Amino acid sequence: VHVTEVDINVYKCYIQKMETILISRGQVAELLPLDVCIDAVETAFRLLGEGKVAHPSTLGVHVGNGGFHVKAGAAALDREWFAAKINANFPRNPVRFGLPTIQGLVALFDAENGRPLALLDSSELTALRTAAATAVAAKHLARPDSTTATVVGCGRQGKAQLRALGRVLRLGRAFALDADGARAQSFARDLTSELSLDVTAVEDLPSALSETDVLVTCTPSPTAFVRRKDVRPGTFIAAVGADDEGKQEIEESLMAASVVVVDLLPQAALIGDLHHAIARGLMRAEDVRAELGAVVAGRAQGRTSREEITIFDSTGIALQDLVAAVAVYERAQDRAPRFNFGD
């Protein structure tokens, strides 16, 4: 058989098309600047608000010391994409095994032909895209003159949250709280230096809230700790931690007394802080002002007065993972190892 150079090049091209890029946690952090992620997530919510994408609900599987969450979705951006994320959430990992609380993978596919394009570590990507969603929500739901933030939960997610808020608000100071006081102190030192922001570790949440414009909660708490009586008028709250039915951060009466915007209503009504208020009979799904996508797309209002307490119930949607994964993939072509599953 006579094999020409053209034949060889065609074969090489075919093999390259079959290859899947493998992208590590460090590469995700390097290839996904926070500003890029915020822009991508804002575009994603706009598409959702315009009705151009669809989402299945999340799948949750609970096991002894934690659980697994599966989210998947497709969207037409410059081309058709599909992404699926499997995240493991084991809150006791750092103490028991020296492992991160959240671990997992994102699989990115070409939705025109089904080809697996990339496998990415999900932990850094999840932190970035979740923080980006908070930043997008803050643009529409926080008072524009907000200067003081409080972060409850001082892990990787908490750090990403404060960094993201600093991209969209002119923060002057922040308070940090964590069940582990030493971690809050470390958080305050690191972020004060990194962001040139006055970050103080505190232990008393009600006292911090008396001076807070923006509150972010990113904990695995099973019971509400943000109470209606402690939150002052005009506060914006990003409730990030409750992403399954066994978690809760916001008191039900506070949810009912606030303007609530969610990322995805059917999902938030099942697993977000919203579902606790619904279960208590204090809210109905119809009481939610809007999904964030509708607000971003200009089809619904966000904040309408300085006095409103606004809450973004953030349960996390697959579209956030998809657009973040695409942004990383497009920057990783010549910088990440490849694997051919067809070999």
Regions found by a protein language model. Give the residues of each.
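NAD(P)-binding Rossmann-fold cofactor-contacting core
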Residues: V168-E194
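Rossmann-like adenosine-cofactor binding region
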Residues: S196-L282
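Glycine-rich adenosine-cofactor-binding loop
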Residues: A131-T134, A142-V168, D178-R183
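N-terminal ligand-binding/catalytic initiation module
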Residues: D7-A127, A135, D145, A290, ...
